[in-house]
C-alpha cells in the first residue's frame, strides 16, 4: 500500500505534474496550468512543435522534452532519473488530459513505482465536455478512446460491448465515421447517438439522433474535424419492444448481402436485438 500526501510530504525527489491543455480554445487554459508550466524544470510534450506554439502564446520559456508513444519506452527511465534527482516535470498531451489516449499512463505508473509524487491538474477533457452536453445519460459511462480500424476487429468489438448499459464514448476519424456507424447499427441496433465535432472551436457541432438518422444526414453532409462519438447504453426493455416492429429476417439478409456468412449474420442480428439465436435461425430458414 502507498499513501501520497501531495503537498505535505517533504521529499528530495521532484514532482510529476499532469497538465491539461486546451482542446481547441486557448481561453480554456487555466491560470494554474500556466503557472505550473512556468515553474517546472522540464515539460514532457507529445509534439514539441504543437506545444511550442502553446508555450509561446503564454510566454512560457521552460525547456521541452519530446515524449510520445514511439519513444516512451526509452525515455521513461531517463525521466524517472530526473525526478529522483529533484527535478520537477510537467507532462502534456497535444490537447486535453494527459494519460488519455497518450503514453502518459506508463510514465505515471513508473513514477508511482519509484515513490515519486504525481499531481494531476483539472482542466479540459474532450470526453466529459461532450458527454455533459450530449443529452445522453452521463452516468454510468465508459470511454474507450480510438476504435479498431479494421472492419472485422471493429465488429467483434461492438458485438462484445452491445449489451453494456453504460453510455459509451469513442474517438473516430471523420473519414471512417460512416463505416463505423454502419457497423455499430448492425451490432447495436438503431440506438440514440451523438456525434460531436470541432469541440470548443468555431465550428463546434452536435449531431443528435438515432444511428440511422445520423447516417442519412452524413450522406448529404460532408464531415470535417476531430470527432467524438457518444452512444446510448443498452436498454433491454426498449430493445425487446423494438424487435416486434423490425423484420429481423430482412436484416439477416442484408448482412449476407454485405458479405457475411449466414450463421454469422444470424449471430450478429440476434445479439443486436437480444433475441434467441436458435429461434432466429429457425425463422430465417423457415423451419
Curated annotation (Swiss-Prot):
It is an enzyme of class 2 (transferase). Its EC number is 2.1.1.198. It catalyses: cytidine(1402) in 16S rRNA + S-adenosyl-L-methionine = 2'-O-methylcytidine(1402) in 16S rRNA + S-adenosyl-L-homocysteine + H(+). It is found in: Cytoplasm. The keyword Methyltransferase applies. It comes from the Bacteria. Its main location: cytoplasm. The keyword Transferase applies. PROSITE patterns: RSMI (PS01296). Keywords: Cytoplasm, Methyltransferase, rRNA processing, S-adenosyl-L-methionine, Transferase. GO terms for molecular function: rRNA (cytosine-2'-O-)-methyltransferase activity. InterPro entries: 4pyrrol_Mease, 4pyrrol_Methylase_sf, 4pyrrole_Mease_sub1, 4pyrrole_Mease_sub2, rRNA_ssu_MeTfrase_I, SAM_MeTrfase_RsmI_CS. Transmembrane segments: none annotated. GO terms for cellular component: cytoplasm. Belongs to the methyltransferase superfamily. RsmI family. Catalyzes the 2'-O-methylation of the ribose of cytidine 1402 (C1402) in 16S rRNA. This is Ribosomal RNA small subunit methyltransferase I.
Amino acid at each position: 500500500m502507498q499513501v501520497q500526501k501531495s503537498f505535505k510530504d517533504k521529499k528530495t525527489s521532484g514532482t510529476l505534474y499532469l497538465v491539461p491543455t486546451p482542446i481547441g480554445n486557448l481561453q480554456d487554459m487555466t491560470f494554474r496550468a500556466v503557472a505550473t508550466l512556468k515553474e517546472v524544470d522540464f515539460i514532457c510534450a507529445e509534439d514539441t512543435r504543437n506545444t511550442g506554439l502553446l508555450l509561446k502564446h503564454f510566454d512560457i520559456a521552460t525547456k521541452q522534452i519530446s515524449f510520445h508513444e514511439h519513444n516512451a519506452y526509452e525515455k521513461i527511465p531517463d525521466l524517472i532519473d530526473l525526478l529522483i534527482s529533484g527535478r520537477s516535470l510537467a507532462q502534456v498531451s497535444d490537447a486535453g488530459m494527459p494519460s488519455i489516449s497518450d503514453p502518459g499512463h506508463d510514465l505515471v505508473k513508473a513514477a508511482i513505482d519509484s515513490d515519486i509524487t504525481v499531481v494531476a491538474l483539472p482542466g479540459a477533457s474532450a470526453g466529459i465536455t461532450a458527454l455533459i452536453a450530449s443529452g445522453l445519460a452521463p452516468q454510468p459511462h465508459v470511454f474507450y478512446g480510438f476504435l479498431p480500424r479494421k472492419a472485422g476487429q471493429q465488429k467483434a468489438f461492438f458485438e462484445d460491448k452491445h449489451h453494456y448499459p453504460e453510455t459509451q464514448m469513442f474517438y473516430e476519424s471523420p473519414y471512417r465515421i460512416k463505416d463505423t456507424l454502419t457497423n455499430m447499427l448492425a451490432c447495436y441496433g438503431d440506438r440514440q447517438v451523438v456525434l460531436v465535432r470541432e469541440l470548443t472551436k468555431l465550428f463546434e457541432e452536435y449531431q443528435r439522433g438515432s444511428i440511422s438518422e445520423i447516417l442519412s444526414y452524413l450522406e448529404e453532409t460532408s464531415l470535417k474535424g476531430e470527432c467524438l462519438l457518444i452512444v446510448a447504453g443498452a436498454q433491454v426493455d426498449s430493445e425487446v419492444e423494438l424487435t416486434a416492429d423490425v423484420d429481423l429476417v430482412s436484416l439477416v439478409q442484408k448482412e449476407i448481402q454485405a458479405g457475411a456468412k449466414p450463421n454469422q449474420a444470424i449471430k450478429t442480428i440476434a445479439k443486436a436485438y437480444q433475441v434467441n439465436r436458435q429461434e432466429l435461425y429457425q425463422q430465417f430458414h423457415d423451419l
